[in-house]
Amino acid sequence: MRKPVIAGNWKMNMTCTEAIEYMRVLIPLLKDIPKKDREVVIAPPFTALYPLSEFIRDKNDCLSLSSQNVHWEDSGAYTAEVSPLMLNELSVKCAIVGHSEPRKYFSESDEQINKRAKSAQDHQLIPIVCVGETFQQREMGEAERVIRRQIEQGLEGIEVKKLIVAYEPIWAIGTGKTCEANEANRICGLIRKWIGYEDVIIQYGGSVKSNNIDEIMSMSDIDGVLVGGASLDPTNFARIANYEKI
């Protein structure tokens, strides 16, 4: 049985004060979600992880925190990076790796993403490994080849039972364009086949909103969502977390 994971990636948004106020609104709106039914994860900026880890402690069983990245070394001369040991101290549960923005802006390779994912697992963090194609790659009929390469190289040596994969078609991130639910479901099914483990959690990400979440979560091979901009409003994100299958 695959338990859905609804994750909100705040990216470079929210001060610590804003993050706490956000949680004051969000937590009461999640009170009717049983832990056994689904999990809700928030990935704030690194600066907000400590105050949020203290604030949400013992407040909601289904709510946990994720980092937006993690380095493969425990410490060292890696300016602007965060180590898995630092995240362990904050009771962080997950770590996003391979998001399209670091891939694009910082030229992150599948090899680096693989090292980050392994480091996360070695330190009892669940990596949320992001994969997805550009619009040009999709138009040229290369989407499946690109995603399969990202899966094979990014997940080499990874324990698939302790993993979340997020399919994020890059052309749908922050653009308002959403991959059709049936097509997203088809790709997620292929990812499951390529990984070779039926119970791996596979999320969809890309312009997920409160008005399309019910349809997305009704798909058989989609086990959750990784939400960007729509997660910045607590009421809106609560509606997404409280989805109802069609």
UniProtKB/Swiss-Prot annotation:
InterPro entries: Aldolase_TIM, TIM_sf, TrioseP_Isoase_bac/euk, Triosephosphate_isomerase, Triosephosphate_isomerase_AS. It is an enzyme of class 5 (isomerase). Keywords: Cytoplasm, Gluconeogenesis, Glycolysis, Isomerase. This is Triosephosphate isomerase. The keyword Isomerase applies. The active site is at 99 (electrophile), 168 (proton acceptor). It catalyses: D-glyceraldehyde 3-phosphate = dihydroxyacetone phosphate. The keyword Acyltransferase does not apply. It is found in: Cytoplasm. It comes from the Bacteria. Its EC number is 5.3.1.1. One of its GO terms (biological process) is glycolytic process. GO terms for cellular component: cytosol. Homodimer. GO terms for molecular function: triose-phosphate isomerase activity. Pathway: Carbohydrate biosynthesis; gluconeogenesis; Carbohydrate degradation; glycolysis; D-glyceraldehyde 3-phosphate from glycerone phosphate: step 1/1. Involved in the gluconeogenesis. Catalyzes stereospecifically the conversion of dihydroxyacetone phosphate (DHAP) to D-glyceraldehyde-3-phosphate (G3P). Belongs to the triosephosphate isomerase family. It comes from Prochlorococcus marinus (strain NATL1A). Substrate binds at residues 9-11, 174, 207, 228-229.
